[in-house]
Amino acid sequence: MAASKVKQDMPPPGGYGPIDYKRNLPRRGLSGYSMFAVGIGALIFGYWRMMRWNQERRRLLIEDLEARIALMPLFQAEKDRRTLQILRENLEEEAIIMKDVPNWKVGESVFHTTRWVPPLIGEMYGLRTKEEMSNANFGFTWYT
């Protein structure tokens, strides 16, 4: 038996047509220059907004400071009234405690001067509860 002849595939007559091998990607978005320009514009806008906000913050800070300065004499007067009230109550308590001690002068200054010496918190709240002293030292606290 004779072997059959193998027929090899050949190109068509005249050859194959040209093959398009270049990438054909659609154009997407902005060009690099326009994206750079948009970025610079956003940066400039952000700096401008930040500058405006800093001016507003500075104006609000000055307003707060002026309000605090205006109210400072009132707060100082309230603090002085509270201090004098506590000292008066301490003098009354001292008179009760030291009534049996001879030659004891109630309210005599331990400093031998006529100048006003602001009392320390320990002196003011020495005859009061620990809770009142800790509130005076650290402010009012809700936690234990």
Swiss-Prot record:
Q: Report the main location listed first in the record.
A: mitochondrion
Write down the Pfam families for this protein, in alphabetical order. Answer: GRIM-19 (PF06212)
Note the topology in the membrane.
Answer: Single-pass membrane protein
GO MF terms listed in the record are: ATP binding
Sorted alphabetically, the Gene Ontology BP terms of this entry are:
aerobic respiration; cellular response to interferon-beta; cellular response to retinoic acid; extrinsic apoptotic signaling pathway; mitochondrial respiratory chain complex I assembly; negative regulation of DNA-templated transcription; positive regulation of execution phase of apoptosis; positive regulation of protein catabolic process
Please provide, in alphabetical order, the Gene Ontology terms of the cellular component aspect for this entry: cytoplasm; mitochondrial inner membrane; mitochondrion; nucleoplasm; nucleus; respiratory chain complex; respiratory chain complex I
Q: Which cysteines are joined by disulfide bonds?
A: none
Q: Keywords in UniProt for this one? A: Acetylation, Apoptosis, Electron transport, Membrane, Mitochondrion, Mitochondrion inner membrane, Nucleus, Respiratory chain, Transmembrane, Transmembrane helix, Transport
Q: Could you name the domain of life of the organism this protein comes from?
A: Eukaryota
Where does it live in the cell? Mitochondrion inner membrane; Nucleus
User: What are the transmembrane regions?
Assistant: 30-51
| Modified residues annotated as N-acetylalanine in this record | 2
Q: What does this protein do?
A: Accessory subunit of the mitochondrial membrane respiratory chain NADH dehydrogenase (Complex I), that is believed not to be involved in catalysis. Complex I functions in the transfer of electrons from NADH to the respiratory chain. The immediate electron acceptor for the enzyme is believed to be ubiquinone. Involved in the interferon/all-trans-retinoic acid (IFN/RA) induced cell death. This apoptotic activity is inhibited by interaction with viral IRF1. Prevents the transactivation of STAT3 target genes.
List, alphabetically, the PANTHER family matched.
Answer: NADH DEHYDROGENASE [UBIQUINONE] 1 ALPHA SUBCOMPLEX SUBUNIT 13, NADH DEHYDROGENASE UBIQUINONE 1 ALPHA SUBCOMPLEX SUBUNIT 13
Task: Family membership, please give it.
Answer: Belongs to the complex I NDUFA13 subunit family.
Subunit comment: Complex I is composed of 45 different subunits. Interacts with CARD15, but not with CARD4. Interacts with STAT3, but not with STAT1, STAT2 and STAT5A. Interacts with OLFM4.
Could you identify this protein by its name?
NADH dehydrogenase [ubiquinone] 1 alpha subcomplex subunit 13
**From what organism does this protein derive?**
Mus musculus
Q: What is the lineage of its organism?
A: Eukaryota, Metazoa, Chordata, Craniata, Vertebrata
